[in-house]
Amino acid sequence: MLSWVEKYRPKSLKDVAGHEKVKEKLKTWIESYLKGETPKPILLVGPPGCGKTTLAYALANDYGFEVIELNASDKRNSSAIKKVVGHAATSSSIFGKKFLIVLDEVDGISGKEDAGGVSELIKVIKKAKNPIILTANDAYAPSIRSLLPYVEVIQLNPVHTNSVYKVLKKIAEKEGLDVDDKTLKMIAQHSAGDLRSAINDLEALALSGDLSYEAAQKLPDRKREANIFDALRVILKTTHYGIATTALMNVDETPDVVIEWIAENVPKEYEKPEEVARAFEYLSKADRYLGRVMRRQNYSFWKYATTLMTAGVALSKDEKYRKWTPYSYPKIFRLLTKTKAEREILNKILKKIGEKTHTSSKRARFDLQMLKLLAKENPSVAADLVDYFEIKEDELKVLVGDKLASEILKILKEKKKLERKKKKEKEKLEKEKKKEEKAKEKQSNLIIQPKEIKEEVKAEVEKKEEVKEKIVEKPKAEEVKEKSKTEEKETKKDKKKGKKKKEDKGKQLTLDAFFK
């Protein structure tokens, strides 16, 4: 049993709800193929349920083309695309029919399973002789960015609520449902432009047997979160105040982020210089209110900023531009991402300066600028400051660049070397000084002062006198007299002996006398 979505899928373009201008473009495009021309493939971009695939099949049916489809459920890697799409792009069916190739949800071609898919698809497009229609929810998906130059992008908007209601009304009549218009309109409102979801919801209520208005109210709200590209498209395409101001309602971004997106893409969309000038005048005013939000922490200013950056910019142009514009990611965000590491390093330096100088980050930032200036004008002084603030090599390179950093570090290295040398010399002198002091102290312990010498000599003399008195006592008179008599006797005796020897010497010594 077919679902109602498939059962009531339009077989012809005239039965497709809405998208009148898109249908005309598709007719012109397919007819150029029938004339032997080979225009660029079409990329239909729009939210889920807006009728992208239905349009492709209805177009093929109207012009007698056989559809070759490759959707998200199929493998779409390099070999699969080459095998299926590559062959169909350059040949016809056995019945002589031409092929219309439909690649559904090409923005989902990514990951290992689909490796090389987009690259192979570009090769196929370059050689294709048959028409190719691609569909995507998001034309700005990174996975298909390289594909955009080779296709013509056609933007589809969500199906209008009235168009959804009309389709539901027809289905209800064909199915014989007893349902009032109020309930059908509620289902249409809940769909948020997703016709497929609306048909599924009606079928679910019919199967449940409850087609009341209350049951329709309980249906899940299918409002999708709009991405920033959807919001940009609304703001930059419309000239209606009310539509522009509601463009950001479902966007999960703060005004300070949105303003960067708008500023980046205004010059891409607006063609007249005066329009661009007016738009940036409104953006400038919006930015002032955002500044007040930051300074005063008063978020009520956001509503003024939002109105200026949406309605103000939208009404700056003289006319709507029907062209498709490839909107860009803000360069400032790419730059901030690129310089994130550098900014973290600068914040570290600011913290070091603040801690050393006991100042605020604002004042430290001023000191940082002075340090950068000194690095150019007086690298020697800058080297001292780098040392004082304990700034590392990688931090210095971010601050002043590699060349200046190398020069300052070289100076600092020489200064450090000189300091170490001076320190060693100082330590050496201190050691020698201490050595001399110790030697003097030792010598001073050996040398006695004059007063001490006098006292010691006196004490020594007294000591010697005492010893002398004990050893050498004065002799008595009798002992002296007796000693002199003894000496006289010894003297006389010695004289007699000497006389006798003299006489003996003069006599002849005989043998008898010799032996006697």
UniProtKB/Swiss-Prot annotation:
Biased composition (Basic and acidic residues): 426-443, 474-493
Annotated ATP binding sites: G46, P47, P48, G49, C50, G51, K52, T53
Pfam families referenced in this protein's UniProt entry, alphabetically: AAA, RCF1-5-like_lid
GO molecular function annotation: ATP binding; ATP hydrolysis activity; DNA clamp loader activity
SUPFAM superfamilies: P-loop containing nucleoside triphosphate hydrolases
Keywords annotated in UniProt: ATP-binding, DNA replication, Nucleotide-binding
Region annotation (Disordered) ranges: 422-445, 474-516
Disulfide bonds, paired cysteine numbers: none
Record bears the keyword Ligase: no
Stored CDD domains: AAA, HLD_clamp_RFC
A single BP term in Gene Ontology: DNA replication
HAMAP family per UniProt: RfcL (MF_01508)
Functional summary from the UniProt entry: Part of the RFC clamp loader complex which loads the PCNA sliding clamp onto DNA.
Family: Belongs to the activator 1 small subunits family. RfcL subfamily.
Subunit details: Heteromultimer composed of small subunits (RfcS) and large subunits (RfcL).
The protein, known as: Replication factor C large subunit
Organism expressing this protein natively: Methanocaldococcus jannaschii (strain ATCC 43067 / DSM 2661 / JAL-1 / JCM 10045 / NBRC 100440)
